[in-house]
């Protein structure tokens, strides 16, 4: 299994990589939505993208919308990593193509639970 971690915070990227490495998941990283789309056009296959919402250049909502509109990696699951939990945001993210949410701050257990909801054994 392969995951793409997209977050402008190096701390969050390193923490997610550490947790996913412990689950046996290979990871690559991107610093914003634009960088993520560039990685995804390199013909690499990913099963999961963990996508921060608030980033410079291209935010997570713009990225997931562009990804789904371009029909890039249609089988890849997108988990939004966010501090925003209001219903209007969740509706907007789901409408743009997100599959699940991981609320910051998160624990290893909450990440595992969300992975299982997406159908990944964690």
Give the predicted meaning of each segment.
Residues 106-115:
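C-terminal output helix
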């Amino acid at each position: 299994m392969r995951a793409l971690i997209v977050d402008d915070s190096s701390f969050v990227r390193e923490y997610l990589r550490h947790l996913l490495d412990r689950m046996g998941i290979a990871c690559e990283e991107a610093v914003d939505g634009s960088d993520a789309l560039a990685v995804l056009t390199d013909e690499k296959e990913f099963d999961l993208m963990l996508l921060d919402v608030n980033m410079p250049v291209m935010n997570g909502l713009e990225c997931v919308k562009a990804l789904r509109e371009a029909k890039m990696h249609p089988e890849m699951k997108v988990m939004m990593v966010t501090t925003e939990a209001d219903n209007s945001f969740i509706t907007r993210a789901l409408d743009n193509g997100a599959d699940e949410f991981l609320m910051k701050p998160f624990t290893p257990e909450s990440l595992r639970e969300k992975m299982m909801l997406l159908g990944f054994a964690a």
